[in-house]
Amino acid sequence: MPRSLKKGPFVDDHLLKKVDVQNEKNTKQVIKTWSRRSTIIPDFIGHTFAVHDGRKHVPVFVTEAMVGHKLGEFAPTRTFKGHIKDDRKSKRR
């Protein structure tokens, strides 16, 4: 069930303050955050966020197409290394 429209998108306050400060100063520094749950709003366009994936911070550059999505969607938490090839010939010997 999606969030109610009357509530508006959720954005952590500390994250919004950091973006507002950078917009006032016209700077584009990387903003380190653990807030994967924050919704991307139009104020975030053009900023780079370092989103934590559980072990490191993944850089995410925000574009117009990302508005409305969550920051965590662009920082995958699981690394798939692939399945090991099943070598049937060596098992027979």
From Swiss-Prot:
Gene3D superfamilies: 30s Ribosomal Protein S19, Chain A
Keywords in alphabetical order: Ribonucleoprotein, Ribosomal protein, RNA-binding, rRNA-binding
Domain of life: Bacteria
Matches recorded under Pfam families: Ribosomal_S19 (PF00203)
Cellular component annotations (GO), alphabetically ordered: cytoplasm; small ribosomal subunit
Protein name as catalogued: Small ribosomal subunit protein uS19
GO biological process, alphabetically ordered: ribosomal small subunit assembly; translation
Family of the protein in this entry: Belongs to the universal ribosomal protein uS19 family.
One Gene Ontology molecular-function label: rRNA binding
Matches recorded under InterPro entries: Ribosomal_uS19, Ribosomal_uS19_bac-type, Ribosomal_uS19_CS, Ribosomal_uS19_SF
Gene: rpsS
Function: Protein S19 forms a complex with S13 that binds strongly to the 16S ribosomal RNA.
HAMAP family: Ribosomal_uS19
